[in-house]
Structures are given as structure tokens and as C-alpha cells.
From Swiss-Prot:
Gene3D superfamilies listed in its UniProt record: 2.40.40.20, 3.10.450.40, RNA polymerase ii (3.30.1490.180), RNA polymerase II, clamp domain (4.10.860.120), RNA polymerase Rpb1, domain 3 (1.10.274.100)
Phenotypic effect of disruption: Blocked in the perpetuation of CNN, CG and CNG methylation in repeated endogenous DNA accompanied by a reduction in 24-nt siRNAs. Reduction of heterochromatin association into chromocenters, coincident with losses in cytosine methylation at pericentromeric 5S gene clusters and AtSN1 retroelements. Impaired RNA-directed DNA methylation-dependent (RdDM) silencing. Defective in the maintenance of post-transcriptional RNA silencing.
GO CC annotations, alphabetized: mitochondrion; nuclear body; nucleolus; nucleus; plastid; RNA polymerase complex; RNA polymerase IV complex; RNA polymerase V complex
Region annotation Bridging helix: where it falls in the sequence: 751-763
Protein name: DNA-directed RNA polymerase V subunit 1
Keywords of the record: DNA-directed RNA polymerase, Magnesium, Metal-binding, Nucleotidyltransferase, Nucleus, Repeat, Transcription, Transcription regulation, Transferase, Zinc
Pfam families linked to this entry: DUF3223, RNA_pol_Rpb1_2, RNA_pol_Rpb1_3, RNA_pol_Rpb1_5
Residues annotated for Mg(2+) binding in this entry: 449, 451, 453
Species per Swiss-Prot/TrEMBL record: Arabidopsis thaliana (Mouse-ear cress)
Gene name per UniProt: NRPE1
Positions with biased composition (Basic and acidic residues): 1281-1291, 1298-1307, 1349-1371, 1415-1430, 1648-1678
GO molecular function terms attached to this record: DNA binding; DNA-directed RNA polymerase activity; metal ion binding
Stated consequence of mutating residue 49 to R: In nrpe1-12; decreased DNA methylation
Amino acid sequence: MEEESTSEILDGEIVGITFALASHHEICIQSISESAINHPSQLTNAFLGLPLEFGKCESCGATEPDKCEGHFGYIQLPVPIYHPAHVNELKQMLSLLCLKCLKIKKAKGTSGGLADRLLGVCCEEASQISIKDRASDGASYLELKLPSRSRLQPGCWNFLERYGYRYGSDYTRPLLAREVKEILRRIPEESRKKLTAKGHIPQEGYILEYLPVPPNCLSVPEASDGFSTMSVDPSRIELKDVLKKVIAIKSSRSGETNFESHKAEASEMFRVVDTYLQVRGTAKAARNIDMRYGVSKISDSSSSKAWTEKMRTLFIRKGSGFSSRSVITGDAYRHVNEVGIPIEIAQRITFEERVSVHNRGYLQKLVDDKLCLSYTQGSTTYSLRDGSKGHTELKPGQVVHRRVMDGDVVFINRPPTTHKHSLQALRVYVHEDNTVKINPLMCSPLSADFDGDCVHLFYPQSLSAKAEVMELFSVEKQLLSSHTGQLILQMGSDSLLSLRVMLERVFLDKATAQQLAMYGSLSLPPPALRKSSKSGPAWTVFQILQLAFPERLSCKGDRFLVDGSDLLKFDFGVDAMGSIINEIVTSIFLEKGPKETLGFFDSLQPLLMESLFAEGFSLSLEDLSMSRADMDVIHNLIIREISPMVSRLRLSYRDELQLENSIHKVKEVAANFMLKSYSIRNLIDIKSNSAITKLVQQTGFLGLQLSDKKKFYTKTLVEDMAIFCKRKYGRISSSGDFGIVKGCFFHGLDPYEEMAHSIAAREVIVRSSRGLAEPGTLFKNLMAVLRDIVITNDGTVRNTCSNSVIQFKYGVDSERGHQGLFEAGEPVGVLAATAMSNPAYKAVLDSSPNSNSSWELMKEVLLCKVNFQNTTNDRRVILYLNECHCGKRFCQENAACTVRNKLNKVSLKDTAVEFLVEYRKQPTISEIFGIDSCLHGHIHLNKTLLQDWNISMQDIHQKCEDVINSLGQKKKKKATDDFKRTSLSVSECCSFRDPCGSKGSDMPCLTFSYNATDPDLERTLDVLCNTVYPVLLEIVIKGDSRICSANIIWNSSDMTTWIRNRHASRRGEWVLDVTVEKSAVKQSGDAWRVVIDSCLSVLHLIDTKRSIPYSVKQVQELLGLSCAFEQAVQRLSASVRMVSKGVLKEHIILLANNMTCSGTMLGFNSGGYKALTRSLNIKAPFTEATLIAPRKCFEKAAEKCHTDSLSTVVGSCSWGKRVDVGTGSQFELLWNQKETGLDDKEETDVYSFLQMVISTTNADAFVSSPGFDVTEEEMAEWAESPERDSALGEPKFEDSADFQNLHDEGKPSGANWEKSSSWDNGCSGGSEWGVSKSTGGEANPESNWEKTTNVEKEDAWSSWNTRKDAQESSKSDSGGAWGIKTKDADADTTPNWETSPAPKDSIVPENNEPTSDVWGHKSVSDKSWDKKNWGTESAPAAWGSTDAAVWGSSDKKNSETESDAAAWGSRDKNNSDVGSGAGVLGPWNKKSSETESNGATWGSSDKTKSGAAAWNSWDKKNIETDSEPAAWGSQGKKNSETESGPAAWGAWDKKKSETEPGPAGWGMGDKKNSETELGPAAMGNWDKKKSDTKSGPAAWGSTDAAAWGSSDKNNSETESDAAAWGSRNKKTSEIESGAGAWGSWGQPSPTAEDKDTNEDDRNPWVSLKETKSREKDDKERSQWGNPAKKFPSSGGWSNGGGADWKGNRNHTPRPPRSEDNLAPMFTATRQRLDSFTSEEQELLSDVEPVMRTLRKIMHPSAYPDGDPISDDDKTFVLEKILNFHPQKETKLGSGVDFITVDKHTIFSDSRCFFVVSTDGAKQDFSYRKSLNNYLMKKYPDRAEEFIDKYFTKPRPSGNRDRNNQDATPPGEEQSQPPNQSIGNGGDDFQTQTQSQSPSQTRAQSPSQAQAQSPSQTQSQSQSQSQSQSQSQSQSQSQSQSQSQSQSQSQSPSQTQTQSPSQTQAQAQSPSSQSPSQTQT
């Protein structure tokens, strides 16, 4: 039966508590009675539970108070009323509703037009109504109000009749609670959802109809007469008033109530209920209850307090039923982990033991010996005390309550418990004395001594409690301090004294040695002296001391050596004794463990005590007496050292510190005199500051006793004492009036000194009580915020409430080896809180200036406010000064004075000496001034000061005139007319002076007069003296009026504002502490802006890289959160060091991390806690109630219906849940990795993700500051750039590994053509196109041609498809631009492309390219690649000349130009069939020109005989070209079996186009029938993923031709002959290129000496240099658009010296961002995930993981060329790839031996898979074919469309397509071939082109590629010059608009202008260049 009944009861667990307002139904069902209480006598009814005056509970029948939980009742109110606590919330919620239709009000329109009036409101009559909360006679209610300006319509309130009453004919109308109740009931569900989304939840409880009556047990007992058992509760009196009012209202009614009577009843009811709830919600009534009831409190133990005692025991008291409290004394002979308990306590407190078959005999013996008090059987307890009858036989299952015995575990605590070690688990021994005894070594962790301190002892009962106590509180588990990491047990003064005395004896006789050896852990060794002349054998002190060592101990230190437990070396110095013992103990702990360490203490402590008791020690008054000569020396020191400073004591806080240091020096001198005494030297720890202070006070002097700063007594008391001192001593004492006491206790104090000392002593007493309020509040706040911060099992530090990561690792950088201190589950938040509060308490308890400043610094950081407060610290700025290397002395001091003089404001009153008014006769005045004034004011100024400050009288006159004139123009000022009539003048030498003085004759003078309309002299005199003169005195004549003060201070490394100078190491330096006037600061950041603005003229003296605002919050505003974090850590560390020996850095870092984890600096106060919980989305009302008023907290939670998940420590403990800390922390076992998604091998870069979601709202927050542009250059240099490791070539940041150059899968380096180069992208000039430097060169897998820019403010240099036309030109540099001669090692073979300056009218297109050098002038009439022209139409001999026609040369007469190398996109104005002009990459869908060519045709396409597909034939579908030499843009042949043909420069979207390679197309190699994964990336194979560009023979850019982008290599390991134009970065840097490659636009060229540091720069167009051949690199050329620099332009947050693309400088505080890190949004083939349909998602999920794994396997970093892949990868490739290949059997051959990834035999810049058969045969195979075949078989109906979409290169965006269509000539569509798919691999490549002769396929020799005659050059130049004029005329309009943007965006150094004549000359005279300069 029992089993059945128990099985029916299901286990439950509280998972959360939801708060809400109690509804009427809930109040009724909680009541024990179904009927309401309607008589006052029922308020103390027996149905409401115990306690009662007599009888039992009528509801549950209980008779004992602790058995009855109490029962509720309720009072029914006669009229509904508003809940007094929620009227405001109800008002806010109803304000959102239309009171007629109860829908959410629509937001008001901004235009205010007719449409808004008609459509903007739902109900016209209710739209104008507003709701206000009113209060009258103590009653609150809601009131409806119409606008007073509106016309009052009759019946405007009639719509409210549906809710209650039709009432009201005025502009206002009360809204009754009854009506609101009906409104809340009728709110539709849709409106409820919208209100809930806005944070307002409609609840029935907003209206009160039923008032709960609490149980009897919840009455707060405030008074008792000693007899009655019912407690008197003031809230019960108020509740009776409520009930009386209810009865009165009900009895007064007659019939139905109308609106007015309803309103009156509700107001009366509201008042009494509100009063009741106010009293009910407070712990004590405001008035004196004892006097009110005439009852005095009598202490009794009656049952009336049973419930109260229970509540206090459970929730308030630290004591419990199993605890005791007693005074402690010391016993050095007991073990450290033992505690002695008096037998009286041990007999009364019991431990529970359950009887079992195993312990029955043991417990029976205890019962028989009368050691048990009682036993329990079932629910009955039986006593076993003396006198009980009979013999008790124990049975299994009974519970025995035995007394405390020796060996029991208890834990001890001494309040206040401010740190972990205040709780210590100890073993019990029972003794006969009356105090609790502990080992003196335990005083340190308990912060106790033996002067009467009391401790609490707790006796854990259950087995789990005992186990927890031993694991958490045992001494051996707590030997290391959680605060400092040092040992918590320290030898006391008596032990050290005994040790010093022992060491002086050297030898011990036999009796002494044997007596002391009894306490050692080892046996007594043989004596050192067998026999002496005077005595027997003798042992050395070392032999006795080493008896305490563990066996076989070996350790050493600087001052001791122990080997084999033999003490071989020991420093006898008195001062070193304590530290040596600590070092030995630490060594034992590290070598032997905590158990042996405790054993050492247990042996050494009694041994030393025994020695001291036997030897004895004495101290006499003679030891404290100093000679008169020594006293005179000390007094003279006081007069010489201290007296000169006391006069300045009250000037600044730093003077106090200097005074304290001076007193400390004098103390040291006095202590040295005193330590001559042998006894004092042994007794005193001379390294202890407190010990020395006490000794000096006894025999030397008391020092500073009174101070007017940071004390609890007032400044008036100090001044009164000073007056008393002067009156008593006159001028004898120069320091006594400042609180310096020269006397000492030994010689006695005089009355004044005694008075000063008593004030100081009393202040210490007050400080220890009242002063602890502030640090106590800080400790409470720290605990509230940090209580839930623990280390989780994964090593991260998290907040258990929200599972938010606060810190990724804890203590990883610790050099002290404290990792063992903090394991998983450790509540490190609590440890950090206690570690910080301990120094805070110390700082407040100690009243020294040092401690005061420490506490102030702690508060500045830990209690920083959420919002800007405009305090003094918020307005302070610390200015550092620049280094001066001139070699002169005092440069920094002079600079500091210069800046201070510039900032410090000097008002006229600072220089004024005297003020005189002169009366002159009328004619004299008129002659001089031309006015009618008789009175003339003179302000005489200090000439010396004016000269020192370099202020002229003219400056003074001008400033005074300005102020007087401005005051005279103000309106509504009484004195305005007076200032208008005031005249000013100045003179260097005043003629009017005081007759009594002669020195005033040469005084500068400011003269002013008042031109009165009436001759009233009194009125004139009053205006001069009381109106004009005060204003003149306040006028600032020098400096900045916005600056309050500017002080030069000494800043050292131990100061909180220290910023290290990386270029100079010094102990300190002079800085300026500037404070801004409060009136000048309106918002956060103003102080910094004002100071920088004031310092513009001296900014060259200021180190802006290190200058910071003083406030941590302001540091965050200016420099960002990371800088604020570092400052918080630094300042907290400095403040702690002032008062404590040190706190572990882990604690301070955790504090700072918790303050900044929300994204802003939040202090440990209520505001910071609220902001933190909001940011982390934590709803924890119970925890919040510990920090904020609990009632308000719960009311707010009820309004918002918050749910406390009880995941916090407070919530868990409150509801009996296990807390998630320590071993109780939760974890889960994951059995299946696939279900949890942990089998995904792909790693996600957290920084990429953060950059993807980064906000740009504060993008331009820094531009608004005055003077910002001036400091940009300084700040740009300050930006942290990576420092490259010379060995590895990788960028290294000093403080993080955030920016690692990892080209992960999905993010390879590539050309980022579409990147926005704006601030918001975080890009800077030194990095790739649009690649954020922080990504270390990571780029998109494909070129982002179609990607729209993320930021529309400014477009990138090459944003070919951006939405805005960029209007800012790029910097046109003189070296390395297109067409500018570059330098190479082989200068003779380097072509010179159009070396010419930029023309003045050069057109800068929207993509910001260099204009004068870029293939001639660009035609930007269509403004982008989307339109007809890209670049220029023609250029004069651009890039040299070719055989027949140069690029862009256009034959106007013949559209069919025959040439060996057709013009590069040559264009004829009259024939659209001719290709585009030079550089006109033009219409993407444009029909190819019918140009016949024999050579490589750049950009020309021929339907019959063409070099290749034109450069601009980007979207041709199937151009059947018959090419002789492969053109630059040639396309693959139709239906070729290629995986990827040689991608032409623009062949983007071709679907199996036909291409026939000719000899030496740009970037093309010979195509043979071989299988490659990727073809050669010719001319910018823009969409290939890992294209390793290697040109074929004589390709464009080959080293033989000294092409762009390649450097001449002498190394045999060079991987490419030439990096083709646009060859993208390989991940392993396999392509080598020169620095001058076409495309390294924004990067400076490294010099030879910078080769190691710069060669790893990732550039999208310039192929990378190879690491292994870097030492053989030739001199590199200047890059395109940038002059060569001598420093690397590495990635980072600054420009690194490279020119930015728009002339903007790098703004350091911005975090970098890049769109390249959006890899999770794209597939492995760079297609957008959202572009696939739901049906295609199945195919995508099938093929995408395979593709990503393949990318990783084929990555060069995975397997070097030719290496076999691993077995796992081999299995993957065989099963997933080769198994589906259409030619599987052929590829497998005789069997697979292994699979490799290697370079293709033909296309050596491509990597592909090779299968090596067992017979040694090696064949390549294509994964594309395999995947296509697999998809076609598995999804035959969907595969083809999916393959086209998945493997297709990114297409242009819609805008581009539309523009292309517009640009297509008529008839173009008809000529376009149909779409055909094309492969994307290098496998089974079969060319279907016509056969070519060897001469056609043979590569051209260098001479063929270069040799040209001057005549050819001349003819080409002429043809180009003809088209040049057309190009200029077309682009003229554009140049005008762009010239404005140039002037705005570029600095003068970046803008180079040329005259039109220069431009024309360039266009017409290209023939003047040498042939070598015009070769291609």
C-alpha cells in the first residue's frame, strides 16, 4: 500500500516564479472562507491561523505556531477603485488606446496634411482625448481631457456610456475605476498583443474590488504588553479602518449610485486602502508605536513570538538552531585545524545519527554512557536525559541526537564575512574552559584577535552538509588566499620573537633539546657537539628547527637552503625572519602539498612557544627612552622637513601626499634611533608600517592629527583648534596650528596636543561604524551583480542567469600559477567582489591621505554612472607632451608652461592692483574724452605680471571693449543702457595716482567712464563701482574662458592616468591636468573637444596619441570600449596597491569585463545593474529586490508579468533550489554529435561574425569635435598596426591574435572590385581593395562584381556597380601610376608607360582611378561600367605602341581594321561594328565588332577571323570565334569538355562559349588535352576561387617582357613566369609579383630592407610573393597610384602611410569592417543562400558539404604539391567524387594506390586531383564532372537548373543589367547566340577549335613582343591624338562637376593640377618619347 501511495505522488521542481497582479478570482480562491469578512472582529478570527490568544487554528486544526502556515481572507469593496501602486502604469497603457474602438492609436503624421487627418485616426471624436493622473485630497484617479483650444462638441463624452456612465459636458471628465474595468475587459485580442509587445499588459488586478486579509502569522509584532499572546500590528488598525469605511459606504446607500456618488465613494475608499497598503508595506510605522499604544516592550519568551523567531531564524539571522556564539582565546599547542568548544555548549548541541545495523553497537554505547540527549521514532521524540526511566534499546531506523564530541566537524565564522576565508571548517575538541579556543595562526583568515572578539560556530547535521563543509571550508583547501594567491596563515609576532631569541643562542643543551624535540615531526638527530668542556652534548638551533620539516624536504631560496630536511643556510637578519618562514612554507606547500604544510605549522608553532616560555622575554621603560640628543634631531627634522609644507597643506591633495611622505621619512629616522634597543628590535617587525607608527607615537612624535580634508569632523573644528593653538602658543609653533603634534606618549602630551589626539582617535571610532556605509553599499552592489558569475565546464566565465559569456578564459595569463585556485564551478564573481571590497574597507578605515585617495579612485571607476553627470571628473583632461630630442634641458618643462599659459584663463582681477575713481572738472574731461562725464574709474594693473604673461594693454582694451559692447546689445537687461554709455581707454603709464604712493606712476591703467544723461554724481558713481567695475574684473584677458584650471602635475607609473610611452621608458613625466568650466560642457565629450580646440595653436607640443580624458566614461566616448576597459583595469590596480599588498589581476580583469560586457561601461550601482539586466535580458526580481526597494521591485515585476527563472543564486536559495555554483553546477552529456550539430568540421571565425553584425550608427561620431582634423594625422600614426615577424612574415598584434591572416575556406583572397572604401567599411589605404585590414587580407572567394555597396556615403575606388557616383578623386601620385616609368633591377627592359603629369582638366571618374596615366583620358559620360564606356575612349600612345594599331587607335575611314594586333577595343565613331576604344571595356552585352586581326586583339571580337573575344564581350553567349592568337578576353570553345577554360578577363557568364587559343594571349597558356581543376586565370580570372595565375609563353606580364605585376626572378623556384593582370592571391602565396603590379593601388612599395616585413601583403591583383624566394627578390617597383615608401603598408587600423582612396585619413577609433566576412551567407561557390528555392535546398544540402570539404582538401595549406592525401580524405574523395565520375573505370585503372593534389602538368598554376594507380599510372580527374553526374542521376528533373545556378559565376545586379540593355544597339539581341552551359574544371580538356599551324600556336619571342620602330610609334600616336580630342569633348561636362569634389575631398598634397595646355601637349606629342618608353 505504501508503495502504491508513494508512486502516485509525482516529483516536481520549481522552474520559475511568474509575477502578476492578483485577479479578483485569485483573491477569492486563496481565501479560507467563501464569504468576505464583514466585521472587525473577524480580522483576528481563528480561521486566519496561528498564533491566537487561545485555542487552535479553525482551518487546519494546528495547535503549534510552526505547524500552521496561516490562511487568507478577503474584504469585498463596495466600489471598484484603482490599485494605488499602479495608477501611472494604467495611465500609460490607456494612453496608447483609442477609448472608443479600443484599437492602438496610430502615430501622428508628420506632414499634418488632409490625408493624415482623414486616415491617421480611427475615431475622430476620441482622437484628441488625453489621459492625465490627478490627485485630490489624497485620492488618485485618471482624468480625460480635451484640448482647450478645440471646440467643445455637445455629447463629446457620450461614447463612454458603453463603459458605465454618460457624463460630462466640460473639457475634462474623471474616468472611474468601474469604467476602466470594463475597458480592460473589452480590449480585443489584437490590441492586447500589441500592448504586450510595447511592454504594457492589460490585467484585471489594476482595479481593486477585493482586498486580501493576511494571516495572523504575518502580523509584524511591534509592541507587547507581556501578557497577550496576540501581537499588535499597526497595519491591522488601518485594515479595521478600511472595513469600517466599507460598512459605512454600504449602509449609506439608497438605490442605484450615480456618477457623482460613485466618484465620491471611490475617492474615500481609495484613501483608506492606500493608507493601509503604505503601512502594510513598511517594516515599521513612521510614528512611535510604543507611545501610541501606551505599552512598553517587555522581553518574554511567550508563544506570541514563536512565528517571529522562526522567520528571523530562517531569513534574517546568521544563527540557527544548531549554532553557538562565544568569545575566542588562543591555544598555540593545538593543531591549526582544531577548535576547542566549552563542555557546556557541547552538552546542549547535538548531531543526528540514524541507527543502522552497522553503527547500532556504537550508538547503543553512547546511549548507555548518557552521551545522547534524545531519539526519534517516527514523528515522536523521546528524551534520554538523566532521570528517564528504564533502559533504552535502539532499533534500526531510529534517529539518535548525540552530543558534540571530539573529532566532529564544525565551521567557524567571525562577522563581518567579507571574504571566502572568513568561514573555516575545523575539528572539535571539548575542554573545560568557558571560551572557544583556536590556534593563533587562524587569526589572520578570520581577521580576529584575542581582545574580546566573538565568533559564530555552526554544526552541520546532514551528511551532505558535512561533506560540503569539508570540501569548501576546510583549512587545507583554503591555504592560498583567493584574493592575493599568498598563504593565509602567517606566523605571529610571538612566534617570530621566539625564533629570533632562539637563533641568538646558537647551541642548546640536552634537556632543552629533548624538551623541544617532543613537538617535532622527526626524531632528534645526534648532537652537533658530542661533549664540551662545560657541559654535555649540544644541539644547534638549526637541528631543532628542522625537526618540524617533512621528511626528505629539499628547497632553496635567496636566503635559505634546505636539503634532505637539513637546514643548511638561514639568514639571521631580524627583518628577514618572517619572509623567510613564508618562503619555506610556500616551498613545502608546492612540493609536499597542503597536508604537510599544516603538519609543519602544527610542529613549529608549539616548538617556538615552548622555547619562548622556557627562555622568557622582557621589555622595560628604559628600552623606550630616547636620549635628548636623539629627540632634538627628530624635532629639528620636523621643523626642517614638515614645517615648510604645512603652510601649503590645504592647497591641493598632492601636497597632502607630499606631507605624508615627509612625515614617513622622519618616522624612519626616529625608528632607527629606537631600534638600537635589543628588546625592541626583536619584538618589532620593522617592515610593518603600522608597527613603526605605533612605536614612533610611543617614543617619538604623534605626527599629523588634524586635517581639513576627507574627515568626518568639520573644517570649522580644525580652524577653531588652529585659533586655540595660536592663542596659547603664539608664534612659537609653526606646525601645531595645522594639526602636527610633536609630543609622544612616553614623555606625555600637553592639553592642546591631547585635545588634537582625542579628536583624531574619536574620528577613527566614528569612521569604523558610520564610515563603513559607503564601502558596505559598494560590497552589496558588487555581490548583487557578480554573485551569479561562475566558471563553467568549458572554461568560460558566464552569467548563470542569461548564460552570457563574460570572459572567454580565466587566469590563462597568470604567471603565478593560480590556475588551481579556480576550477569549473568556482564562483569567481563572488571572489572578485570580496577581493575588491576588502581594500575598500581598508581604505575607509584608514584615514590617511593615501587611503582617502585610494577610496576616491575606486569610486570613480566602480561607481561610474550610466548617464553623463557633468561632474568635475567628467570635465578633466590629461594632456601628455611630445618628446623633444633637441638635446637641450628642461624642454618638457618649458612646453608644459607654454601649454598651461595658453589654457589658463587670466581675468582682469588677477592683475588688478587698485581701483580709483577720479573726479575731474568738466572742461578737462571734455577735452580729453569728448564727453560730459566728471567721474573717471582707474584700474591699475600689475606691470610685472603683465610682462610675465605677455599681455599687452591693447589686448586688454580690445577684450574689454568686446565684452562691454556685447552686454550693451542684450535685450531685457536693466544694465544694458549703462553699458552702452560706458567708454574705455588704456594707458601704459597712468597720470592719476594716489598722492600717498609714488610707485603707481608707472602702472598700466584701464580707464573707464560713464556718460550719464543727468548730472547725478551719486548715480554715476554707483554705476561705475557696482555695475561696470565688477564686470570688468571678471573679463578674461588671456587664456580660454572655457577652461577652469590647468595644472602641471607629475605623473608616474603608479598613477591611475599613466599612459606608457612606447618609445621612451621613464619613471614619470610632467603632464597637464586641465579642467573645463561646467558651463562650457553640455554633453558627453564636450570637455575633450573644448580642450583640443583651445590647444590648436600649441598642438604640436601635445602628444595627442597619449592624451586622454580623465573620466573612464569619457575615455569610452572618445577612444572606445577597449581603451576604457584597459583604463579601468589600470586604475583599479593602482588604487588597490595604495592600501593592499595586492589583489590578483584575474579579479580586477573580471570586474572590468563585467562592467563592459554590455557594450558600455556600467558601474556597480542600481542604475548600472538595471542597464546590465536590460542588455543581458535578465528578469530576476528576487535578485533585484536585494539591491532596490523590494516592494517597488515586485510591483514593477507584477506590472510587466516578469518571470524569475530562479537561475540566480538569490532566487535559487529563496526557493530551496540547488545553486549552480561549485560542484552543484549543471552540465549535460551529449551522446550524439549529429543531433547537436557538433560534427560540423567547419570553424566559424567569431570576428568575422562580429564584423557582419557590427553597427554603423556611430560612424561619424568623432568628426564633430573641434580640432579633430588637426589631430587626425597624429592619431593615424597612433593606430596599432601589426608588427611583422621577420621570420614568418605574418602580421603580429601586440595585444591580441584577433587579426590572423587565415584564408579560411569560404574567404580566400580575391579581387574586391565592388568594395566600398568608406569609413564604414573600415578599409584603409594600405590594404586591399575594400578589404578590411583587420581581416589580414581575407577576401571573397570570387570577385564581388555584383555586390552592391554596403555604405552609400562614399563609393570605392573601383566600385563598378555602386549606386552612387563617387565624387572624390584619388590621389594622383607621381611614381608608379599607370603609364609612369617604374624602376626595376633590369631598368633597360622595363617599359615606360606614358610618364606624364596629370593634366589640369583631367577627368576623374566615379571609381576614383588615376586619370592622366590610365590609358589616356577616361570618358565618363556614362559614369560607370554599367554604361557604354569604361575608362577612356582613346589615349595618346597609351602603353606604348603595337605593330599596326595601338590600343584605342581608331581608323575613322575603315571599320574593318586589319592589324597584327587589333586595337584594344578600338572604336570607330561612325561604325558601331568597330570595337570599343582604348580602355572602353564598354557595353557588356554589346555585339562584338567585326574586326579582322592577325595578332592578339584586346577587346575586339570577330565573327569570322578574330584574335579572340573582345575584352568587353562579357555577356556573349556563344561567340564562335576563329582566333589566331588568343586575345585578352578569349573565351572557351563551345561544348568543350573543360571544367574551366582559360578565363578571359571579362568572360564572366559565358555558358560553354567557344574559344580557340592563339599564341600568347594575355595571361593565357597553351591548352592541351589534359585535365585541370582550374584553367589559367588570364587577365584577372576574377571569379575563380583558387586561381594560381601563371602565364603561358610570352604572356602579357611575363618576366621577359618586364610586365606589370611581375618582378624579374633569379630564383629557380619562381612559380610563375609572370603574374597576369588580375591574377589573384593564392592562399599559400604561390604567385610572385613585383610591387609595381597593376592593381596594387593603395599600397606603398616596400624597399629592399623592408622585404621581410612587407612581402606578405595580400593584394587582390598583384600575385603574392613566395616565402621561400623572398631573399632573392629584386628591387620592387612603385605601385600603381602610390609613391614608394620606406615602411610597410601592413594591415591594421591605420593607413600605414599609404594614400587613402578619397583623401580621407584613417580614424583610429573605428573598428574595421568588411563585407568579405559574410561567408555564412554564401555557398562554397559564392552564391547567395537565399537565391535557392525550397526545392533546390535539398540539392544544396547534398552538394554543399562536399564542396566545402573539397575546398579544404585542395587548399595548399592542407597538402603541399604532390603529397598524398590522408586516408580519411582519400576515402572521402573516392566515395563522394571519383565514385560518380563518368569515366570512373578509366580513372581507377588497375587499382588506386593513393590520391594527390598537385599542379596540373599543362596549367601549372592550377591544382587538381590526381589518382595514382598501383601500376604507377597517374591521371587527373575533375570533381565538377563527378558532382554534375551525381546530381543528374539523383535529381534528373532538377539537377540541370541547379547546376547552372550553383556553379555559375555571380552575375551583374539588376541596375547593371538594365543599363546594359539600354546600351545595346538595335539588332544586338538578334546576333547573340543562345545560352549554353560551360564547365568549370580543368579536367578532360578537349579543345574543339580548328587546327593551327605551329607558327600560330608558338609563343612570341620577347623581341617580337617588343620590337617596334619609331615610325610605328609615330603613326599610332597620331591616330590616338585624333580620338583624344573627342574624348576630351565628351568628358568636359563631367570634369566640371568632379573638380569640385576633388577640391573638397583631397588635401593640397593629394591634388595635382595641370593647365589645359599641358594636357593638350601630352595628347599631341607622344612621339617625343623614346621607343623603349612606348613598348608594350
